[in-house]
């Protein structure tokens, strides 16, 4: 019996690989809700965790201009997705997985090798 891929509510393709991670939104029991961000993986050193940096514009009322800001978010990296440093990924909000992890990687939009 082949393991089914769950519908997570986003219009993206599920990963081709299978995994047995219970914290995987595709093959496990993890539900996603809330915000969805796109960013670049800047670190993948902790096991099953990536640090994603996203850039956004913030309006400064005094100067009537926008400034570019960035934030770093820790996200769970399931084995079936396996994002690496330099990859452009899509992350979605979920329940707290640890003290600092509240997001999970749901897709790799562009691999680091393809971006060069």
Curated annotation (Swiss-Prot):
Keyword field contains Ribonucleoprotein: yes
Keywords: Ribonucleoprotein, Ribosomal protein, RNA-binding, rRNA-binding
GO BP: translation
UniProt xrefs under Pfam families: Ribosomal_S17
Gene3D superfamilies linked to this entry: 2.40.50.1000
GO molecular function, one term: rRNA binding
GO cellular component, one term: cytosolic small ribosomal subunit
Subunit and interaction comment: Part of the 30S ribosomal subunit.
PANTHER family assigned: 40S RIBOSOMAL PROTEIN S11 FAMILY MEMBER (PTHR10744), 40S RIBOSOMAL PROTEIN S11-RELATED (PTHR10744:SF9)
Function: One of the primary rRNA binding proteins, it binds specifically to the 5'-end of 16S ribosomal RNA.
HAMAP family for the chain: Ribosomal_uS17_A
Family per similarity comment: Belongs to the universal ribosomal protein uS17 family.
Protein name in the entry: Small ribosomal subunit protein uS17
Protein source organism: Pyrococcus horikoshii (strain ATCC 700860 / DSM 12428 / JCM 9974 / NBRC 100139 / OT-3)
């Amino acid at each position: 019996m082949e393991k089914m891929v769950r519908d997570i509510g986003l219009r993206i393709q599920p990963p081709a690989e299978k995994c047995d991670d219970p914290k995987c939104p595709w093959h496990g029991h993890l539900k996603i809700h809330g915000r969805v961000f796109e960013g670049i993986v800047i670190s993948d050193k902790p096991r099953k965790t990536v640090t994603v940096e996203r850039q956004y514009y913030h309006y400064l009322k005094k100067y009537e201009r926008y400034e570019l800001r960035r934030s770093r978010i820790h996200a769970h990296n399931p084995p079936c997705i396996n994002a690496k440093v330099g990859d452009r990924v899509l992350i979605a909000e979920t329940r707290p997985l640890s003290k600092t992890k509240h997001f999970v990687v749901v897709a790799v939009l562009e691999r680091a090798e393809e971006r060069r």
